[in-house]
């Protein structure tokens, strides 16, 4: 590029100068995050350091392969970043092998399937309606199209995992892989029981700990090891890192298969800037403050659930052992889709969610899913989450009394209280 063709602002102009339209959207999103309460259980707020790593010059570097075994030159420094992420992940989860290249939790699961399954093999995972995940064999997902997917659920009496059903289905269908974990499981999972069931039929055991990995790392939730053959996770959610995935194992033979399954199996060049963000987040998670944070995540979840129950709502399983809960709205006579939108107008962000044995359609639902990681990162404690619960009840009671079209005054009043609460706990003051 000659001086005549070199863009004079390419290396110096800010996004606001080069692309005001895009900058405006990002600025609006920053405002939303600052001014609204984030209760989506799968979301969190990363540190300025993680954002700096992810926005670094590592985004320029192609690095197909693994540290020390790349297909491109000039990888000596990205190797340092990836090795930091790997070593820190192994230390966090007390395991022997970690692949930090998956671009998402879904791709981490896909990598495991690629490594140990063939099309048509039987897998046994949790039913989506009971709290499982799309990648555990749901019909619309690739995992449900490529494999013979069988699903277990929860007991109707208490909405806890039906381990007797898991054993019966495993005995009947002889799966090659059993999956424990999901996207809406508020209680701890008995990994030893899953291991016993897997051993009884000669199956691999995969623990998908995408939602509770941060709790595991901090000792606030039982570890899947030594029971699991392999564990997968996202690196955001409770781990509070950039959006991405990871595969962990103690089995050296499986580790080689997982590495080959990710590259060259399902991915090409890894996202080195994201891996740098993972390394930064894992470094934060190794500090004592992270243990205190995760302890507060759980305490806040207990407080939120307790106050919602006091307000006349039901919590599936009666409470939570983790960061997440499912709120049953049926006692108030309203549905998840209506409540989700009303809370959004009040600047409380949630998602509608089916509950076990839900009589409503998936687009309607009888519940909403709530989580405490993002609010806890912001600095909210138990008293703030009790206040948030009361605000949720205020909106829901308003809907029940006034209907969706007549609830504007209630939502406006709650929106003002949300603004006051968020103002006490500001986000990203330097942005």
From Swiss-Prot:
The record marks 236 as: Plays an important role in substrate specificity. It catalyses: (6R)-5,10-methylene-5,6,7,8-tetrahydrofolate + glycine + H2O = (6S)-5,6,7,8-tetrahydrofolate + L-serine. SUPFAM superfamilies: PLP-dependent transferases. It is an enzyme of class 2 (transferase). The keyword Zinc does not apply. It comes from the Bacteria. Pathway: One-carbon metabolism; tetrahydrofolate interconversion; Amino-acid biosynthesis; glycine biosynthesis; glycine from L-serine: step 1/1. Its cofactor is pyridoxal 5'-phosphate. The modification N6-(pyridoxal phosphate)lysine is found at residue 237. Keywords: Amino-acid biosynthesis, Cytoplasm, One-carbon metabolism, Pyridoxal phosphate, Transferase. Homodimer. This is Serine hydroxymethyltransferase.
């Amino acid at each position: 590029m000659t001086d005549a063709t070199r863009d004079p602002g390419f290396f110096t102009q800010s996004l606001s100068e080069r692309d005001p339209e895009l900058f405006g959207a990002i600025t609006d999103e920053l405002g939303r995050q600052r001014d609204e309460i984030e209760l989506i259980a799968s979301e969190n707020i990363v540190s300025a350091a993680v954002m700096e790593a992810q926005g670094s010059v590592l985004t320029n570097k192609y690095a197909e392969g693994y540290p020390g075994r790349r297909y491109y030159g000039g990888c000596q420094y990205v190797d340092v970043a990836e090795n930091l992420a790997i070593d820190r992940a192994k230390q966090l989860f007390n395991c022997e092998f970690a692949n930090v290249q998956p671009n998402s939790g879904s791709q981490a699961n896909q990598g495991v399937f690629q490594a140990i399954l063939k099309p048509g093999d039987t897998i046994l995972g949790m039913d989506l309606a009971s709290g499982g995940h799309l990648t555990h064999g749901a019909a619309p997902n690739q995992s449900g199209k490529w494999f013979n997917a069988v699903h277990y659920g929860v007991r109707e009496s208490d909405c806890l995992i039906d381990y007797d059903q898991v054993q019966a289905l495993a005995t009947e269908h002889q799966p090659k892989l059993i999956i424990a974990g999901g996207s809406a499981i508020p209680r701890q999972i008995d990994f030893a029981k899953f291991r016993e069931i897997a051993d009884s039929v000669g199956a691999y055991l995969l623990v998908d700990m995408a939602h509770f990995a941060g709790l595991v790392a901090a000792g606030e939730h039982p570890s899947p090891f030594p029971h699991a053959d392999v564990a997968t996770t996202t690196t955001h959610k409770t781990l509070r890192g950039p959006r991405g995935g990871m595969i962990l194992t103690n089995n050296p033979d499986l580790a080689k298969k997982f590495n080959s399954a990710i590259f060259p199996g399902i991915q090409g060049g890894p996202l080195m800037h994201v891996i740098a963000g993972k390394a930064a987040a894992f470094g934060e998670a190794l500090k004592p403050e992270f243990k205190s944070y995760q302890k507060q995540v759980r305490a806040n979840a207990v407080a939120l659930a307790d106050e919602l129950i006091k307000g006349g709502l039901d919590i599936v399983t009666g409470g939570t052992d983790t960061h997440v809960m499912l709120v049953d709205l049926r006692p108030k006579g309203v549905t998840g889709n209506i409540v989700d939108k009303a809370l959004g107008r009040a600047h409380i962000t949630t998602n509608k969610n089916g509950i076990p044995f839900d009589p409503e359609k998936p687009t309607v639902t009888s519940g909403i899913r709530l989580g405490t990681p993002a609010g806890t990162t912001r600095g909210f404690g138990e008293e703030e989450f009790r206040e948030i619960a009361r605000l949720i009840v205020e909106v829901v009671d308003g809907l029940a009394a006034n209907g969706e079209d007549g609830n504007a005054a209630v939502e406006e009043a709650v929106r003002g209280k949300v603004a006051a609460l968020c103002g006490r706990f500001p986000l990203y003051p330097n942005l």
